[in-house]
Every structure is written in structure tokens, then in C-alpha cells.
Amino acid sequence: MALDKDIVGSIEFLEVVGLQGSTYLLKGPNGENVKLNQSEMNDDDELEVGEEYSFFIYPNRSGELFATQNMPDITKDKYDFAKVLKTDRDGARIDVGLPREVLVPWEDLPKVKSLWPQPGDHLLVTLRIDRENHMYGRLASESVVENMFTPVHDDNLKNEVIEAKPYRVLRIGSFLLSESGYKIFVHESERKAEPRLGESVQVRIIGHNDKGELNGSFLPLAHERLDDDGQVIFDLLVEYDGELPFWDKSSPEAIKEVFNMSKGSFKRAIGHLYKHKIINIETGKITLTKKGWSRIESKE
């Protein structure tokens, strides 16, 4: 029997009609034959034949219809962020909480391949079922985000740095959504490098519009921009994984050899970095802070 795409990708009540080995046989509302592996039950209780239970319905790669009681965060009626597992020539493969990965086709990803997501990034998606009942991930459109974001109508977030993920990347700017639901636009003039689709980035809030959408920047505040000595120290910290065995009590000779600056210049530079929470100064070492790491995107 052909799969009924009305139930694929959704949560439905199905009747248990039998048990074969470790597989329950279920019947859909239109007579669809659906299988349930016991590993996809949410507890150890046996299901009773003749009773109806709630399941999420999905096709496997061969087109067979399967059910699970482990409800995914994403359905064909619900958008959420899904983790990218890997990318290949077909697109990005994501984890939506099912026993199988789901493909976001390459045609839906940015034309510039360097802006494709990488493993560990998160895409804002829903599930899409095509005419052959294959299941794919569909990226959220601008109209979808407009109906789900949390508007902001005051300046309480101005100059705050928050984490967000791009759901749309264009030459004119980056469109991002935070976990709190804030919708943020970063104009191309407020960035030096374009973030990947789905990449977790730190963005500084610089204002909002009448619709409650936030404007952001990937650039530091003018007074936080580094002088030459500060940039030398910052670049070396990045090169050495965010930690250097130097501090304000290091010898002038060692500082001169590594940084090519006097101890006085070094102390002024790390003092500036510390004041703006770019580094931590600890006994015998300096380390990059989370805010410090967030500057990498803006300096590339």
C-alpha cells in the first residue's frame, strides 16, 4: 500500500494489530501498515492489541512506514533547531531525534559552499514530505520566523552580546535567531566575515526597529578595538588555543623575545584586554574569555 503522506512526519493515534518477534504491527487511519520496533517504545510496558496509542510516523530509507514513541522536537508542523551531523554533496544531514538522519538538500543551502553548515552547527527546520513520501528537512523562511520571534521594543539589550544562529545568509547581511527567540539582523557593514548558516556566533545588539526586530554587529565597540600591541597578544592567544604562559610578572626578556615589546607595553596591553573582558589574567598565564573567542569572527 502506498504511504499516506498526511500521516508521515506527524504525530498520530494508531491501532496495535499484532506482534511479530520484536516488531509491533500498527494500522494507520487510512489503513496504512506501520511497524514499531520495541526499541522505539518509551517504556518497557507491552502494548495491547486492539488499543490505540500516540506515535510519530516516519519512512525509513526504503520507504517503509515506521513509528516511534520517542517524539522528535521537529515535525512537519513544528520548527526547531536541529544539529548538523555531516555534510556531503547531497546537502546537510541533521538529527531531528529520530532513529534515522534527515537530509536538507543542497539546493536549499547557500550557493557559496563556504557558508554551508558544518557538523555541530544547528539549522532552523521543519520536516517536508515530497510526492514520493520521502522526508526532508526544510529551512525556515523569513515569513515563518516573523511569526515565531520574540519582539523587543526597548533598549534594554543594547550593547549586550548574545548568542544566536544565522537562519538566512545573504550578501546584504546575516539574519539570526537566538534561543530566546530574538530576531537579529546584522548588515554587511557590521561584519568583516560572513558566518555560516546555523553557526553559533556572538552578536552585539546595537538597536531595534518598530517591529521589534533587533539590529546587531559582529564588530567590537570603538573603545574595545585593539591597538597594535593588544592585537599581537590576541593573535598569539588564538594561535595557541587561547592560553599563553605569560602574565604581568613575566620577565622583560621573555616578553621581548616572544612579543617583541617592552614589559611596560605588554602590561598596558593585557590590562586593556582584561578591562574589556577579552582575557583572564591568572597566575603564570593569560587566557581568552568567551567574549575574546567571539572576536575571531570579526577579525577574520
Curated annotation (Swiss-Prot):
Its protein name is Conserved virulence factor B
Show the InterPro entries listed in the entry. Answer: CvfB_fam (IPR014464), CvfB_S1_2nd (IPR048588), CvfB_S1_3rd (IPR048587), CvfB_S1_st (IPR039566), CvfB_WH (IPR040764), NA-bd_OB-fold (IPR012340), WH-like_DNA-bd_sf (IPR036388)
Gene designation per UniProt: cvfB
Query: Which N-terminal stretch is annotated as signal sequence?
Result: none
* Tagged with keyword Lipoprotein: no
Taxonomic classification: Bacteria, Bacillati, Bacillota, Bacilli, Bacillales
Instruction: State the family named in the UniProt similarity comment for this chain.
Output: Belongs to the CvfB family.
Alphabetized, the UniProt keywords read: Virulence
PANTHER family given for it?
A: CONSERVED VIRULENCE FACTOR B
Task of the protein = Contributes to the expression of virulence factors and to pathogenicity. Involved in the production of hemolysin, DNase, protease and protein A.
Name a Pfam family for this protein: CvfB_1st
